[in-house]
């Protein structure tokens, strides 16, 4: 009984193995047919399309390269009436010649002087069609060589009061005649005077409108030193007043209030006199010496 049961199980296993092998075989055959019948033809068509694209791109590249050698004069010359037509292009040479020498040789041998002139006119007409007339007029306009020579402005340092040295070009231009040099000297003196007037007006406006002692950027060095000294004196006076007020506020120093106030009044007198002497009053005009 045991041997019979074993044989039955072996047969069942053999049958299952054969069934699975048949399934595997059928699947492999299906894959093979799918690859050979569906995938390979599509790949072949795709490769053909790629080859066509490569051929067309190569043809376009050669066409663009040969367009620079097109003989426009041979194609532009047209027959007139019943006149005999000359063989403009030979049988071996197409519309795109192989080299520039052949194109020039064809234009010299095949085309006469009249045909060459007509071709030049045709090319000019085509150029005028694709270009703007206003731009051509702008590029072909008459250019005049005459012009006005501009003078360089006089550069001077306001702090030091130094005058600018004339450049070499101005000296060369003004060295032709003595009269021209005199005129320019007169103009320079007028400019210096006007500049000094402007400085004086600015100083007057500053000291007339505000009471601050901030030096302006156009004030000379001497004025700046005086203003800085006055600011220092005023600041010292303010500090002394603050210290005196602090001392007087204490109860121990109540008895010394009047002498300290008198001393401060006596000390403030000369400072005010010095400030009135050094600071110019509003409305004064400051004159500067000219070093020529």
Curated annotation (Swiss-Prot):
Keyword Secreted applies: no
Subcellular location: Nucleus; Cytoplasm, Cytoskeleton, Spindle; Chromosome, Centromere, Kinetochore; Chromosome
Main localization (coarse): nucleus
Biased composition (Acidic residues): 265-275
Gene Ontology annotations for the cellular component aspect, listed alphabetically: cytoplasm; DASH complex; microtubule; mitotic spindle; mitotic spindle pole body
Pfam families: DASH_Ask1
Coiled coil regions, renumbered to chain: none
InterPro entries per record: DASH_Ask1
UniProt keyword annotations, A-Z: Cell cycle, Cell division, Centromere, Chromosome, Chromosome partition, Cytoplasm, Cytoskeleton, Kinetochore, Microtubule, Mitosis, Nucleus, Phosphoprotein
GO terms under biological process: cell division; mitotic sister chromatid biorientation; protein transport along microtubule to mitotic spindle pole body
Phosphothreonine PTM positions: 140
Sequence segments annotated as region (Disordered): 99-118, 149-194, 226-292
Phosphoserine: residues bearing it: 26, 118, 134, 155-156, 200, 216, 250
Recorded family membership: Belongs to the DASH complex ASK1 family.
Record function comment: Component of the DASH complex that connects microtubules with kinetochores and couples microtubule depolymerisation to chromosome movement; it is involved in retrieving kinetochores to the spindle poles before their re-orientation on the spindle in early mitosis and allows microtubule depolymerization to pull chromosomes apart and resist detachment during anaphase.
PANTHER family: DASH COMPLEX SUBUNIT ASK1
Record's subunit section: Component of the DASH complex consisting of ASK1, DAD1, DAD2, DAD3, DAD4, DAM1, DUO1, HSK3, SPC19 and SPC34, with a stoichiometry of one copy of each subunit per complex. Multiple DASH complexes oligomerize to form a ring that encircles spindle microtubules and organizes the rod-like NDC80 complexes of the outer kinetochore. DASH complex oligomerization strengthens microtubule attachments. On cytoplasmic microtubules, DASH complexes appear to form patches instead of rings.
Protein name from the UniProt record: DASH complex subunit ASK1
Gene name per UniProt: ASK1
